[in-house]
Structures are given as structure tokens and as C-alpha cells.
Amino acid sequence: MIEVLIGLGAGVAGVGAGYLYAKKINDANYNIFLEQAKAKAKAIEYEAELTLKNSKISVQEAEFEAKKRYDDKTTKLQKEYSQKFDELNKKEQILLNEQELLNENKELFEKDRNEAKLTYEEGLNLKATYQSKVQEALKVLEHAAGLTEDEAREVVLKKVEEKSRADIAHIVRKHEEEAKREAKKRVNYILAQATSRFAGEFAAERLINVVNIKNDELKGRIIGKEGRNIKTLEMVLGVDIIIDDTPHAIILSSFNLYRRAIATRVIELLVEDGRIQPARIEDLHKKVTEEFEQSIQEEGENIVIDLGLSKIHPEITKLIGKLKFRASYGQNALAHSLEVAHLAGIIAAETGGDEKLAKRAGLLHDIGKALTHEFEGSHVDLGAEICKRYKEHPVVINAIYAHHGHEEATSIESAAVCAADCLSAARPGARREVLESFLKRVEEVENIAKSKDGIKQAYAINAGREIRVIANAKLINDDEAVLVAKEIAKEIEEKVQYPGEIKVSVIRETRAVDYAK
């Protein structure tokens, strides 16, 4: 029994010990699990904090990016607004300038109309005065002894005529001077605008071209055996070839710029190739001529495009390119036409005309010069005929006629072309005139002035652009001097051809002489 109890007690003790051991293990596992749970909780908490922090950074970056885009957009819009505002200001200024110009023109028109009305009224008053004076004088002279009716009438008419001429001269001089002042002021403004806004290149043509060669041995090859090569060159190319002692150079001379340019290119190719013989010369001449014809067409098309003009007929375009090889008084015709086109466009724009049409007329005003080597007739008639054939604008045709005085300018654009042509052609150094023609023109102008009654002497000065006329003070009074100047100017316009204008100055000097004895 005791043994049983002892065994039972030992079993109970073993069970208790096992329970305690198991509990200890469970407690240890629980603690481990708890620590792991805490660690995971901390990790989750850290990750949550990190995620929150990253989220805040992303939000800040997004806000920064959005603000930057907003600022960029705002800056761009402000810049565009500023540009639009500046453009509107410029347009507004242009409109204001145009309005001011219109107001000035309106004032000038009103002023001219009032002056015309005043002149008309003064004329009526003068007529009435004239008639009343005649009646009064007739009544007085009827009672004068020793005078017949016819003699009295002649005396009265002579006095009235002298008085009327003096009054008319006074009125003409008054209004003419005022009109000249206003016109000169306006013209100076327009010309200043035109010349300041356009600065063209100066192009003067010579009568020779120089071809450089590597050595003087090539001169002999160009001459050829018994002069065969040089004879063929001169016959085919149509130029004079001068081979002298000038080192490393051959001179080509011709008044025809087109032939001279082709000849220069042909000889350059011959010298470069080395094969100089008659057959080769003819082949190269044909090839170079075809290339030049193509380049002429392209040159004309490029000029039309550069000026911003509407389509021009290909034949006229080709003639524009040919102007490059024409010259007038040493001035290149194409350079002159381009200069006139630009100046005419500016002048037309300043005076309320069509700028594009003025440019077109300016470019084509001398187009006939491209035909003068092939056809008979003046360049004015040839140019007008070719433009009529290809249905150019009537203003263009009128400008062609008007710039040499064959017709009156019928539009602002035609008048602008005439003014631009004078600006381009008459400026110092633009053209070279033959001395004989210059002297002949000066002599003709002086003779016209001397042919007038009461003129003692006349002198052409300032390169023939001014004529100073010395009047006899006993035969011509101050009022008559005004009329004489106008008569001389009108006769010069009708009989003398000249570029620009000629100023007529009538000088009358009165001297009172006495002697002390």
C-alpha cells in the first residue's frame, strides 16, 4: 500500500513537473511570439511612417511641379499678352499716323480750294475794276484835247494792260510761293523717307572684262597658228580680244554686256581645259549660251519673288533677267530698275498709293532696254508694247510712257515711278554722260534763255542743272521777271531732254549812278 502511494505520489510529482516544464516552454514561446509581434508592429509602424513621409514628399513635389507649370504658363501668357499689346500699340500708331496724314491732306485740299476760290474772286474783282477803270478813263479822255477816240482807247488799254499784268504777276507769285513751300515740305518728307529706308548697291558697268591666265604661254595658244584661234574667238563670240604686254591677263572689249559675259566665261573654260581649237570654241560657246539663257530666266524669277510681286509672264521675267546685261550711261539697267522699284514702293506707300503695284511698275519701267539690241525703236515704245502684249496692268504701261514724258502720269504709282527714276538716275555719280552731249545740252539751255527779250546774259551752272539769267533792269521789271522765268522753264521742258530738273533763276539788278563834281 505504501509502495502504491509512493508510486502514485511519484507519478503525481512527475506530472506536476511536466506541467511546470511545459508551462515554462509555453511561456518562453509566448514571450518570443510577443517580441516578434512587437517587432513586426514596429516594422509596420516604421513602414507606415516612411510611406507617410514619402507621400508628403510626393505631394510637395507635385505641388511644386504644378506651381512651376502654373508660373511658366502665366509667364508665357503674360509674354504673349505683352507682344499682342505691343503689336496693337504699333497698329494703333500706324493708324494714328495715317489719320494724321489724311487730316493733313484734307487741310491742304481745303486750303487749296479756298485759295482757288479766293483767286477766282480776286480775278472777278480785277475784271470789274478793269471794266470800271476803262469806263472812267474813256470818259476822261473823251474830253481831252488833241486825242482821237482810237488814240485814247489805245492809251487806256496800254495802261490797264500794264496794271493788270502787274496785279496778275503779284497774285501768281504769292500763291505760287505758298504752294511751293507746302509742296517742298511734303516732297522733302517723302523723299527723306524713301532714301532713308532704302540703300541700294551701286552698280557701274565698264566696257572691258579681264580674264586672268596662269602664264603668258597661254596667250600664244589663244592666238593659235596664224591667228586662227583668235579669229574664230572674235567671230563666234562677237567681242574684241586684246592681247598685249599685260602679264597674266587677256582683255575682252565690247559694248554688249551679254556677249562680253559669255565670251569671258568661254575663254575661262578654254584656259582651264587647255584644248583651244575652233571646234571646241564653237561647242563651248553653244553650251555657255544655253547656260546663260537658263540663268537669265532664273534670275528674273528670283527678282520677282524677292520683291513679293504677283505672277509675271515668263517672257517678261526673262527680259528682267536680261536687264543685268544692259547699261545706260554706265549704270547697270537691272540695278537701276531694282532701285526704282524699291524707291517707288516707298514713295507710293507714303502718298497713299499701292506699294506692290508701284514696285511692279518701277521694275518694268525700263523693260524695253532688254530689247533695244534686237529690235528697232525706243525702249519706251518697246517696253510698252511687250507689256500690252502680255496684258500688264494699265498703271505699269502708263509709268513706262510717263517716266520719259510721253504721257502724263495718271496715278500715284506712275508719279512715284517717275520720281524714283529721277532719284536713281540723276544722283551724282550714278551715270556717266558723254562730254559732247553734255556741252550741247548746256549750250541749248543758254541759247533758249538768251533768246528772250530784255535778257543780257545767261549762264548754265551746277553741271547744267541751273541756269542763271541776267535781265536788263530797264526793259524788265520785277513782276515781268517772274513771267520770263516761267516762259524760259516751259520752253526748256519742251525742247531739251535732261535728267532731273533745271532751275531757272532770273536776276534783275537796278543800279543808280551819279557823280559828285
Curated annotation (Swiss-Prot):
Belongs to the RNase Y family. Endoribonuclease that initiates mRNA decay. It is found in: Cell membrane. One of its GO terms (biological process) is mRNA catabolic process. This is Ribonuclease Y. The lineage of its organism: Bacteria, Pseudomonadati, Campylobacterota, Epsilonproteobacteria, Campylobacterales. Keywords: Cell membrane, Endonuclease, Hydrolase, Membrane, Nuclease, RNA-binding, Transmembrane, Transmembrane helix. The gene is rny. HAMAP family: RNase_Y. Gene3D superfamilies: Hypothetical protein af1432, K Homology domain, type 1. It comes from Campylobacter curvus (strain 525.92). InterPro entries: HD/PDEase_dom, HD_domain, HDIG_dom, KH_dom_type_1_sf, Ribonuclease_Y, RNase_Y_N. It is an enzyme of class 3 (hydrolase). PROSITE patterns: HD.
